[in-house]
Amino acid sequence: MIVVDTSAVVDALAVRPVNRLVHERLAGAGDLCAPHLIDTEFLSVLRRLVRTCSLHSVTADAIRNDYAQLTILRFDHLPLSERVWELRHNASAFDATFIALAELLGVPLVICDERIASIPGLRTAIEVYPAG
């Protein structure tokens, strides 16, 4: 079981060529967990990639279908609010939500955003994979 950050899912599905290291990590992780926020963040990233012509809209539709096939256990963010607030000086509320969930579940957070790993006071393992 792991908590998967949006950056890792994007690299596993949307970055071309696909980030094989992240793809293999997610495939072998067992349960993938994330706050409900992941769905909106994922769509936001796809939108940006299409708008900046980094990704064709037809490809984005195929990636959305691949994303829909992922089995991700989604968690409400409200029980995480206190820890998210505690992290406010060093992390965005979005990043802190993923961190807080990993801490609550006692599992690693898998990311492709190395700045998150340098946040002080984290209470969980952070697995950083190079961005694709």
Please report, for each region that a protein language model flagged, where it lies by residue:
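Non-catalytic, well-ordered alpha-helical scaffold segments
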Residues: 7, 40-43, 61, 96-99
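Acidic, PIN/NYN-like endoribonuclease modules and their adjacent C-terminal/linker elements
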Residues: 1, 99-132
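A cross-family signal for key residues in well-ordered alpha-helices
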Residues: 10-11, 44, 82, 100
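Short, well-structured N-terminal submotif of metal-dependent ribonuclease cores
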Residues: 1-38, 49-58, 114, 121, ...
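Active-site-proximal, substrate-binding regions of enzyme catalytic domains
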Residues: 37, 43-75, 83-85
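Active-site neighborhoods of divalent-metal-dependent phosphate/nucleic-acid chemistry enzymes
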Residues: 70-112
